[in-house]
C-alpha cells in the first residue's frame, strides 16, 4: 500500500452502514496499480448528518464520492448539477467537485450495460424482462432504453408498486417501451425474453439457495436468451445456476459492480483506469469471503 502524505488526495464512499462496501477494495487496487497519490476510504454518514457531511467533505478537499444506501436519492437536492442519466434513474451513485459544489451522475447504468455491450448484439426487436421494480430496476430500464431495446417488461408482485413504477417516468422513449405486468404473467412473457434480469434481492444471503424463479420458468427461456442477475454473491446464484444448466449465457452482478466503479474512477481521475485490476481485486475478495 502506498504511503499517505500531506499531498494525498481523498476519494470515498458515503452510506450508512458502509462497512460492507466493496468499493474500497476495487478502487484502492486500481489506484495502487496506477501509482496515483489518492486514497479511497469509507465514510459512514448517518441520514441526519448528510447535509453537513456533504458540505464538510467538500470543504475538506475530498475529490470524489461514491454514494450508496440510504443516500442515493436524498443527496440529490444538495448537488449543484446532476446528469440527465441520474435524473432519469432518480438517484445518484457518483459525485465530483466542480469548483462551485458537488455534481452527480449514476454510473450504475454504464455498469449494467458494459457486459451486454461486450456481446456486440443488435437489441432492436428484442424483449427484455426485469424481475422487480426497485432502484436497481430503474437503472436497468434507463440502460435498456439507451441500448435501443424496444420492449421492456417489468414484472412484480404488487399492482400498486407496479403502477407507481410505470407512472414515474417522463421520458417518451421509456414510456413507449415500458410495460408492467403482474408476477402471474411470467409464464407468458418469459418464452419471448431475449434478456431476463433479476433486480430483486432474492438469492442473496441469508437465503442463497433461493431463486426468484422456479426452475420450470427458467426452462421456458429461449435457447439464445441471456440471464443477468444483479446479485454478486453467491457466485453463481441459484437463478444463474439454473440458467447455466440450460446452456444460456449468464452475467452476474460482480461485473456490473466493477464497471460502475471503473466509470466513476474515470470521472474522478480524468483518465483510463485498469478495469482488470479492479475485477481481480473484487473477485479475490469475494472468493476469500465465500
UniProtKB/Swiss-Prot annotation:
Pfam families: SDH_C, Shikimate_DH, Shikimate_dh_N
One term under GO cellular component: cytosol
GO biological process, one term: chorismate biosynthetic process
EC number: 1.1.1.25
EC top class, as a word: oxidoreductase
GO MF annotation list: NADP binding; shikimate 3-dehydrogenase (NADP+) activity
Family: Belongs to the shikimate dehydrogenase family.
Record protein name field: Shikimate dehydrogenase (NADP(+))
Source organism of this protein record: Synechocystis sp. (strain ATCC 27184 / PCC 6803 / Kazusa)
Amino acid at each position: 500500500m502506498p504511503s499517505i502524505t500531506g499531498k494525498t488526495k481523498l476519494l470515498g464512499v458515503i452510506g450508512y452502514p458502509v462497512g460492507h462496501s466493496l468499493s474500497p477494495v476495487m478502487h484502492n487496487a486500481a489506484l495502487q496499480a496506477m501509482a496515483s497519490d489518492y486514497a479511497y476510504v469509507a465514510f459512514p454518514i448517518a441520514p441526519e448528518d448528510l447535509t453537513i457531511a456533504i458540505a464538510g467533505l467538500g470543504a475538506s478537499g475530498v475529490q470524489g464520492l461514491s454514494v450508496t444506501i440510504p443516500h442515493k436519492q436524498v443527496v440529490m437536492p444538495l448537488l449543484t448539477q446532476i446528469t440527465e442519466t441520474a435524473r432519469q434513474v432518480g438517484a445518484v451513485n457518483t459525485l465530483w467537485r466542480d469548483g462551485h459544489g458537488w455534481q452527480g451522475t449514476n454510473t450504475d447504468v454504464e455498469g449494467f450495460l458494459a457486459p451486454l455491450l461486450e456481446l456486440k448484439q443488435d437489441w432492436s426487436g428484442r424483449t427484455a424482462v426485469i424481475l422487480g421494480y426497485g432502484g436497481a430496476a430503474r437503472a436497468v430500464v434507463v440502460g435498456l432504453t439507451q441500448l435501443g431495446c424496444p420492449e421492456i417488461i417489468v414484472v412484480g408482485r404488487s399492482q400498486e408498486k407496479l403502477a407507481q413504477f410505470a407512472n414515474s417516468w417522463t421520458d417518451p422513449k421509456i414510456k413507449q417501451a415500458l410495460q408492467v405486468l403482474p408476477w402471474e404473467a411470467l409464464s407468458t412473457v418469459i418464452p419471448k425474453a431475449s434478456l431476463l434480469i433479476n433486480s430483486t434481492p432474492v438469492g442473496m444471503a441469508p437465503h442463497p439457495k433461493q431463486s426468484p424463479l422456479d426452475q420450470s420458468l427458467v426452462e421456458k427461456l429461449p435457447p439464445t436468451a441471456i440471464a443477468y442477475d444483479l446479485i454478486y454473491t453467491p457466485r453463481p446464484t441459484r437463478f444463474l445456476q439454473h440458467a447455466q444448466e440450460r446452456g444460456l449465457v449468464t452475467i452476474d452482478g460482480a461485473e456490473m459492480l466493477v464497471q460502475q466503479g471503473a466509470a466513476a474512477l474515470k470521472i474522478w481521475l480524468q483518465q483510463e483506469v485498469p478495469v482488470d485490476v479492479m475485477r481481480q481485486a473484487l473477485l479475490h475478495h469475494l472468493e476469500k469471503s465465500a
